[in-house]
A protein has these predicted regions:
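Gly/Ser-rich helix-loop-strand patches that form or flank binding pockets
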Residues: 4, 10, 24, 28-30, ...
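A short, well-structured beta->alpha microelement
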Residues: 110-117, 223-239
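Small/aliphatic-rich secondary-structure junction motif
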Residues: 2-72, 164-228, 234-235, 245, ...
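A structural motif corresponding to the C-terminal end of an alpha-helix
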Residues: 89-105, 219
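A conditional alpha-helix N-cap/helix-loop micro-motif detector
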Residues: 24, 87, 111, 138, ...
């Protein structure tokens, strides 16, 4: 049973971007499950890509039919129809997922730059969940996800498939304000917690562990601790790879990054990662 605590970082609105790709549908299912557990509102958004619409208006753009493999001119009317159909499929998927999870939900269709529209929607949510790869299906972070992560939104969770989202939480703590928010987020999500203590030496690690333990003791919570002394994200990724189910809660400016960009660091993980920025 989840420990009930008062937390100003409580997650009340969970945003998911839906484009009907397998990865976005997996993100939707995960978001619905989490919304049900946290009694949060599920917010879905589908973005009609303005760049595709402008491209279709050009007289020299061709497309290849999926079934016929024949080349034909890409027409604006056909593009509009395809976008409407995709939005309808996204809305249907949203309704089904919300119904199964029995959560409050809203769904909107926006038109514009995908990154700009999603960042605007994310600014009004407490947590943004998106699939790692989009339509490509590759394990590496997709182009849209990379841009959104680099933009530094509040809290963003990257998932690869339909993972269960309340297993062990591995939150990274280094004493910074961001790591304190990461710890608050872990507290709001669940009681099965591990804390990765990031430190320059063992004395600092002991002090930081005592700091976290004091916070958790006040809330009646316990945690397992792992020290990451002079470590990097690759070492953390290898550590959690041995866990059957794990979500890493990672501060966006963690010392573990060691000069890597966030997208580069995220490519090292095989489990869901929740960024706190």
């Amino acid at each position: 049973m989840r420990q009930k605590v008062s937390n100003p970082d409580k997650i009340r609105r969970i945003l998911v971007a839906i484009d009907a790709s397998p990865q976005s549908l997996a993100a939707l299912e995960a978001a619905a499950e989490l919304a049900a557990d946290l009694d949060a509102e599920l917010v879905g958004v589908y973005v009609e890509d303005i760049n595709l619409i402008r491209l279709a208006a050009l007289p020299v753009v061709l497309e290849t039919g999926e079934a016929s493999a024949q080349t034909r001119r890409l027409e604006s009317s056909r593009m509009d129809r395809q976008l409407r159909n995709q939005a309808a499929r996204a809305a249907q998927a949203m309704a089904l997922a919300a119904s199964r999870a029995q959560v409050r939900w809203t769904f909107t269709v926006a038109r514009g730059s995908i990154e700009a529209e999603l960042l605007h929607a994310a600014s009004e949510a407490d947590l943004f969940i998106l699939g790692r790869a989009g339509w490509s299906g590759k394990r590496r972070l997709g182009s849209t996800a990379r841009k959104l992560v680099a933009a530094g939104n509040n809290r963003t969770m990257i998932i690869e498939r339909g993972e269960r989202l309340l297993p062990t939480l591995m939150t990274v703590y280094d004493g910074s304000d961001q790591s304190k928010r990461a710890l608050d987020t872990a507290i709001s999500l669940g009681e099965y917690m591990a804390v990765g203590i990031v430190a320059e030496d063992e004395d600092q690690a002991k002090a930081l562990q005592s700091e976290v333990a004091a916070i958790l003791d006040l809330l009646g919570l316990k945690a397992r601790y792992r020290w990451l002394v002079r470590a990097d994200t690759r070492e953390l990724a290898n550590m959690v790879r041995t866990q059957e189910e794990c979500i890493v809660i990672l501060p966006g400016e963690s010392p573990l990054l060691e000069g890597k960009s966030l997208p580069e660091a995220l490519d090292e993980f095989e489990c869901p990662v929740l960024l706190v920025q």
